[in-house]
Curated annotation (Swiss-Prot):
Protein name per its UniProtKB record: Peptidyl-tRNA hydrolase
Alphabetized CDD domains for the sequence: PTH
Pfam families in alphabetical order: Pept_tRNA_hydro
Active site, renumbered: 19
GO CC terms: cytoplasm
Protein localization: Cytoplasm
UniProt lineage: Bacteria, Bacillati, Bacillota, Bacilli, Lactobacillales
Gene name tied to this protein: pth
Record's keyword annotation contains ATP-binding: no
Length: 185
């Protein structure tokens, strides 16, 4: 089984905000595969589907961003998901809007959702797909990540989400993560 985790904050007030990029990636993947049967389990909304016979679990933690690991670890244990079979989609302020980058491991880079997952799984060695949201120029980081994309950013962001979805679909069938990184980075 593969597990795709999208990071975000629950609540209507966070819909379409930059920090909900991971949720938007998972939602777009679900939409593409006609998945609308999310249910609540272990502080998360989950749904599953199959790709080439492989079961894939979509996960959207219902904890706030900073406590995402509390939802992820129990699901990994319950479904017996190996770290190599999990990937996390999330926003990255250090990349231009819509740019994606895949990584196999690394620090949290200041992202509190990733920091929480690292703390709960006990390692930095897990797959990630980051989608660029750019860095604030005038506003505070908190106001920026909890804000919505500017009109001129929307097209680039939507392209980034589509590229992240394509990378996640490929990830479900490609065993060599380095090949995937070469294709998308």
């Amino acid at each position: 089984m593969k597990m795709i985790v999208g990071l975000g904050n629950i609540g209507k007030e966070y819909d379409k905000t930059r920090h909900n990029t991971g949720f938007m990636v998972v939602d777009e993947l679900a939409k593409k595969h006609d998945i609308n049967n999310f249910k609540v389990q272990s502080d998360a909304l989950i749904a599953d589907f199959r790709v080439n016979g492989e079961k894939v679990l979509l996960v959207k933690p219902t904890t706030y961003m900073n406590d995402s690991g509390r939802a992820v670890r129990p699901l990994m244990d319950y479904y017996d998901v190996d770290l190599n079979d999990m990937i996390v989609a999330y926003d990255d302020m250090d990349m231009p809007v819509g740019k994606i980058r895949l990584r196999q491991k690394g620090s949290a880079g200041g992202h509190n959702g990733i920091k929480s997952i690292i703390a709960h799984v006990g390692t930095q060695s897990f797959n990630r797909v980051r989608v660029g949201i750019d860095h604030p120029t005038k506003e505070s980081v908190v106001d920026y990540v909890l804000g919505k994309f500017r009109k001129e950013q929307i097209t680039d962001f939507e392209i980034g989400v589509q590229n992240a979805v394509a990378a996640l679909e490929d990830w479900t069938t490609i065993e060599n993560f380095s090949q995937l990184m070469n294709k998308y980075n």
